[in-house]
Swiss-Prot record:
Annotated glycan sites: N142, N283
Pfam families, per the entry: TOR1A_C, Torsin
Subunit structure of this chain's protein: Homohexamer.
Residues making up the signal peptide according to the UniProt record: 1-19
GO cellular component, as recorded: endoplasmic reticulum lumen; nuclear envelope
Record organism: Xenopus laevis (African clawed frog)
Protein name in the entry: Torsin-2A
Annotated binding of ATP, by residue: G86, W87, S88, G89, T90, G91, K92, T93
Record keyword Hydrolase present: no
Location of the protein in the cell: Endoplasmic reticulum lumen
Example GO molecular function: ATP binding
Main location (coarse class): endoplasmic reticulum
Annotated keywords: ATP-binding, Endoplasmic reticulum, Glycoprotein, Nucleotide-binding, Signal
Organism lineage: Eukaryota, Metazoa, Chordata, Craniata, Vertebrata
Lineage: superkingdom: Eukaryota
Length: 314
């Protein structure tokens, strides 16, 4: 294949003197424009999800199916838009990192993977209108550079309502927006909101002695939608993304049982080069706080603090 180079404008988001983020135009050289570092290993993604994500049968199934179908399409009808919901520590951020790892050659270091944090990038509500301009410019500039980009919006429950609507033009079915085809992009929204409702459903299944793996999306989707999209403090409050049905799949993450925490502990110990001795693994697992207080069914923090607890016990 011949080597091809393009010089195109790239937009850089930098902090301005007012506290808002400003968009700067920089020259940007692209090698093999149509590839954009997009190197898919779908089998490795499937394997990684199965081996390293615990207690999330539904999330694994929904994510893998939707991503596989999307990347196998030569002409997708719209960008893939996924919204991940569940309590902290249940695996949302970890799963998004696996997607990045197996979709892009350089993983999270790829210039075509973009992460947004409301607390870091959009902290001041008084700058909301400027943030909208900056965010739209950033998305437009980077999608013009590469239609195979991935955008991850973390902590949507902390985003100022109204801000996310700035990206609505890039999420629909249009062939071309602002001169470029954006339908091969992927957008991930991550939120803790809806976690309480997911937990209630999981707890009801446990109390009724129903198999956890029998929990399906239809058991959760309505409750998540109501909790998230009707919350005036959430980033999706009265959003056109919701009104126009631009989210393709809601992905619930279930609360984790002690057995799942134990798996997390073992895996982390092996990654640290430690011997996962049974007594030590059990002691670390037992140190977590579980709820409800009288039944101790689920971990209050999922697997979030596993690494720090191992360091404490070791």
């Amino acid at each position: 294949m011949a080597v091809r180079w393009w010089i195109i404008p790239m937009l850089l988001l930098v902090p301005g003197s007012s506290g808002a983020w400003e968009v700067l135009s920089l020259p940007f050289s692209l090698y093999n424009f149509y590839e954009c570092g997009f190197k898919v290993d779908i089998e490795a993604l499937d394997c990684d999800l199965a081996r390293n994500v615990f207690g999330q049968h539904l999330a694994q199934e929904l994510l893998f199916k939707s991503v596989k179908e999307f990347i196998e399409s030569d002409n997708p009808s719209k960008p893939l838009v996924l919204s991940l919901h569940g309590w902290s520590g249940t695996g949302k951020t970890f799963v998004s990192s696996l997607l990045v790892k197996h979709l892009f050659k350089e993983g999270s270091q790829s210039r075509f993977v973009h992460f947004f944090s409301p607390v870091l990038h959009f902290p001041r509500v008084q700058n909301l209108e400027q943030y909208k301009v900056d965010l739209k410019g950033w998305i437009q500039g980077n999608l013009t550079a590469c239609g195979r980009s991935l955008f991850v919006f973390e902590e949507m429950d902390k985003m100022h309502p109204g801000l996310i609507d700035a990206i609505v033009p890039f999420l629909g079915t249009s062939w071309v927006v602002y001169g470029s085809n954006y339908r091969k992009a992927i957008f991930l929204f991550i939120s803790n909101a809806g976690g309480d409702d997911i937990n209630e459903v999981a707890l009801d299944f446990w109390r009724q002695r129903k198999d956890r793996e029998d929990i399906r999306l239809h058991h959760l989707e309505s409750a998540i939608s109501k909790a998230v999209f009707s919350n005036p403090k959430h980033g999706f409050w009265q959003s056109q993304i919701i009104n126009q049905h631009l989210i393709d799949v809601i992905v619930p993450f279930l609360p984790l049982r002690p057995s799942h925490v134990r798996q997390c502990v073992r895996t982390e110990m092996v990654q640290q080069g430690l011997e996962p001795e049974e007594v030590l693994v059990n002691n670390i697992t037992d140190s977590f706080v579980y709820f409800p207080e009288d039944e101790k069914v689920f971990s209050s923090t999922g697997c979030k603090t596993v690494a720090s607890r191992i360091n404490y016990f070791v």
